[in-house]
């Protein structure tokens, strides 16, 4: 079996790109898989230097769609199946190249994402454009929450996985804080993700403002297309009184994330929308207790009070953080329960096997063409309490 992964980029990073790259490397241990994507500068670009990765051209919109389409046509006869990894570049490129059979993976809802960036009128436009691109191909999503949003396309659920071995030998807290440049003493919060409005970092800023003994690390780039660094500057201007306690470290390489997690006491994730957040999975795998926003995908992962905590607003988030900060035994028990849950249910091996099973069924013709349905089809287990 030969499979071609088709994605937008690797170099810029982001949880979804890293999660799909992890699936790509995992599958290479079982079948022949190559990755075709666009070239983008970023701290993660060195990940694309492994065998099997090919650039079709630079990451520019909309020209990048044409680059990918041409590259797909050139190699189309060499592959048994095509795995589409993003809705903006690889999906229209594979559609135009008539690459079949193909599977489509969504780790976000592009209809909502476009609406946030460009306004509700673009949300409606995206809905119209997306329908013919997705219809007739198996759609895979990485959470029940996304499956509910795409119900009419009969989505199949393959939960995101994390390479738990990356978190088996973490440095000590003291060594990690020295490495990231944060002095010991205060309770240290950490969040990982791009500094963009959907991450709702004002909640984190409010938590730090309300708890004088707390500092925070924000690990993620704060310049992004469309947003530039406007959101980052707005945060700095809105919270001048806590600038010395909130450290924006920018984008770091994938292998540096475990050290930043090891330096912290509590992981905070106030995002307003996610698919299956890779950052949260990695925080739980590292053994950190987590306090996250109460949104559907987080409810799939978190059993409130046991594997983490769900907060409905910044005041509740601050209260939960304060409780954890004052009770080391609670931090330990919640962090351990979260780590055990991820290791038992959300390993990268389980995710890889689910994709392998999907591909075998698709090539064998066992999966019918997409048609409206009432319930999503589940290929891997979800957490429902």
Please report, for each region that a protein language model flagged, where it lies by residue.
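Aromatic "clamp/platform" in nucleotide-sugar-dependent glycosyltransferases that forms part
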Residues: 272
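Short hydrophobic beta-strand element within catalytic cores of glycosyltransferases
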Residues: 280, 289-292
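Membrane-proximal helix-turn-helix segments that form the acceptor-binding/catalytic region
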Residues: 121-138, 235
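Conserved acidic donor-binding segment of nucleotide-sugar-dependent glycosyltransferases
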Residues: 303-315, 323-329
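Short His-centered aromatic/hydrophobic patch
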Residues: 84-90, 109
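A short, histidine- and acid-enriched strand-loop-helix "catalytic/donor-clamping" loop
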Residues: 103-121, 222
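Short, structured helix-loop element that forms part of the nucleotide-activated donor/catalytic region
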Residues: 44-48, 215-245, 256
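Conserved donor-binding/catalytic core segment of Leloir-type glycosyltransferases
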Residues: 4-5, 183-199, 205-209, 217-219
């Amino acid at each position: 079996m030969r499979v071609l992964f088709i994605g937008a980029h690797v170099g810029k990073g982001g949880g979804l790109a890293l999660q799909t790259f992890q699936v790509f490397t995992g599958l290479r241990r079982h079948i022949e898989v190559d990755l075709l994507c666009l070239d983008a500068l970023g701290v993660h670009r060195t990940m694309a230097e492994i065998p099997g990765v090919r650039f079709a051209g630079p990451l520019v919109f909309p020209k990048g769609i044409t680059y990918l389409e041409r590259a797909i046509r050139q190699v189309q006869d060499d592959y048994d199946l095509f795995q589409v990894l993003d809705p903006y570049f690889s999906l229209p490129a594979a559609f135009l190249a008539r690459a079949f059979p193909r599977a489509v993976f969504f780790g976000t809802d592009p209809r909502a994402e476009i609406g946030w960036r460009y306004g509700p009128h673009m949300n409606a436009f995206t809905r119209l454009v997306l329908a013919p691109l997705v219809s007739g191909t198996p759609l895979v999503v990485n959470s029940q929450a996304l499956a509910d949003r795409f119900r009419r396309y009969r989505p199949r659920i393959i939960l995101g996985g994390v390479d738990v071995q990356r978190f088996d030998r973490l440095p000590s807290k003291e060594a990690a804080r020295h490495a990231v440049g944060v002095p010991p003493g205060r309770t240290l919060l950490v969040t990982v993700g791009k500094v963009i409005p959907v991450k709702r970092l004002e909640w984190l800023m409010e938590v730090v403002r309300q708890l004088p003994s707390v500092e925070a690390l924000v690990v993620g780039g704060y310049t992004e297309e469309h947003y530039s660094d406007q959101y980052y500057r707005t945060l700095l201007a809105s919270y001048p009184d806590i600038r010395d306690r909130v450290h924006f470290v920018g984008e770091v390489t994938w292998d540096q994330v475990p050290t930043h997690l090891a330096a912290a006491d509590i992981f905070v994730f106030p995002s307003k929308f996610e698919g299956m957040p890779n950052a949260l999975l990695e925080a739980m795998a590292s053994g950190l207790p987590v306090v996250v926003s109460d949104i559907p995908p987080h409810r799939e992962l978190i059993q409130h009070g046991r594997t983490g905590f769900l907060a409905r607003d910044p005041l509740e988030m601050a209260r939960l953080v304060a409780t954890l900060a004052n009770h080391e035994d609670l931090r330990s028990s919640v962090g351990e329960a979260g780590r055990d849950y991820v290791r038992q249910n959300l390993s990268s091996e389980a995710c890889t096997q689910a994709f392998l099973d999907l591909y075998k069924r698709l090539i064998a013709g066992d999966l019918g063409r997409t048609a409206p349905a009432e319930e999503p089809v589940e290929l891997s287990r979800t957490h429902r309490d």
